[in-house]
């Protein structure tokens, strides 16, 4: 076992004083050249600006090397440190220990525990994440979908940037797009000076997230601010770049929207959607018994499944699913966040038509089935009441009870009459040791290399935790947890009582052999057809009423200084006045 645990140094948070100076200086919009950006990464030479094909070939070779493994037999030398109940390689902790924020050093920032993560996007995870050595090698895996060249500097006007709602049809009617476009039309490129930082929402591994307001509007965003020097010193610049590239390509109801991004001399900033409902981990803690009812779980995991399906279609393996990374929007629907551990790879979507000859005839001759192609199972009857989406979910999400349902024609093996799109990056391979201990797949722990099947393992752990309020393989410590994942069988507690279909789905997802795991071959299509999701109308899932809608968030404004009646108040200096207009100063830790 490891020796006495050492506290893990918190990731460097941007200095608000530095943010203030950047917001006042137009030069903050300057971007680094490719040569300068390459120089920020230790050991990275001008070869970074070579064509992507050469970089990909080199980086693909590096993924063939075995990643650092965890010694499960124990060691006298402390091989890991414990941070908030999780294992972190000592090498990473030592790197992060030396990263100290300037504001803390000079006393300009005070300690505070009042800044929680109850409301926000990309909130700080309550558990540490493991990142292996070969991570920097695998990121070069190219994808055929929207992968900008890494040989040029990334600016706010990148060809793949989220610069208008035209390229994001799912957000076409979002008023925040109009606010962004209005400022851009007036001032050109957006920068840090266009936003007021109101509150710190959380602190992740590579940056801090702030609630921000676009000046002159009532539009609120979540701004992720990353210190480029800190990222370079911890060799995490490539992770930040990967997250930005992924966010640029996303357009899905249950995934984040990147409204704009920009860089200053010191910081890299991503402006995303603000989720006032917090994360599912916080929401689960507020439930009676600290677990969700099965009907609520079905709602959340169905939306997560659609988001994962979309990511796999783009050749993105998420690798970091957990309740802390699932945020709740203001309407109660979810949003998956935090993509810095994701792996990009090649994928070839395949359209497979039904192999059941009776299914096509059934679709032509029977008009009682739902006309929506996205319905996995034709359980929605076409009748006047079905025009109201809530009747397809009953109550408001699931089908009507069996006694009230009209008998439907027999479908052989429940084969869908519609074509199936299979888009599973099954050939992807990575040797990185990344993830959260209780969610790590067996193949990651063994160092055997992993692919997209790890997402379906984490999906099973996620489902288990929402239903039972705990993860299935959690041990007394991190090392015991890893042993349990590899060697212990799956067990279900007696309470709370869940349906057989829920337990059966979890059994299929938590198969230790990845080739036998549910979803390994046909991806989300295979999982959506499981009986646990019977009655879910996938085409109308956004019309369903969420289990819980968060209360409207009151945006706190900076407190006004009281004016003394006995003596005239001193006029604030121009710098102080401009500072108060730019953001609200608050404590960091």
From Swiss-Prot:
Its EC number is 2.7.11.1. GO terms for molecular function: ATP binding; protein serine kinase activity; protein serine/threonine kinase activity. Keywords: ATP-binding, Kinase, Nucleotide-binding, Serine/threonine-protein kinase, Transferase. It catalyses: L-seryl-[protein] + ATP = O-phospho-L-seryl-[protein] + ADP + H(+); L-threonyl-[protein] + ATP = O-phospho-L-threonyl-[protein] + ADP + H(+). The active site is at residue 320. Residues 1-167, 551-589 are annotated as: Disordered. Residues 195-533 form the Protein kinase domain. Residues 15-36, 46-55, 63-76 have a biased composition (Polar residues). The keyword Transport does not apply. The keyword Transport does not apply. Residues 142-165 have a biased composition (Low complexity). InterPro entries: Kinase-like_dom_sf, Prot_kinase_dom, Ser/Thr_kinase_AS. ATP binds at residues 201-209, 224. Belongs to the protein kinase superfamily. Ser/Thr protein kinase family. May play a role in the regulation of metabolism and signal transduction processes. This is Protein kinase G11A. It comes from Oryza sativa subsp. indica. The lineage of its organism: Eukaryota, Viridiplantae, Streptophyta, Embryophyta, Tracheophyta.
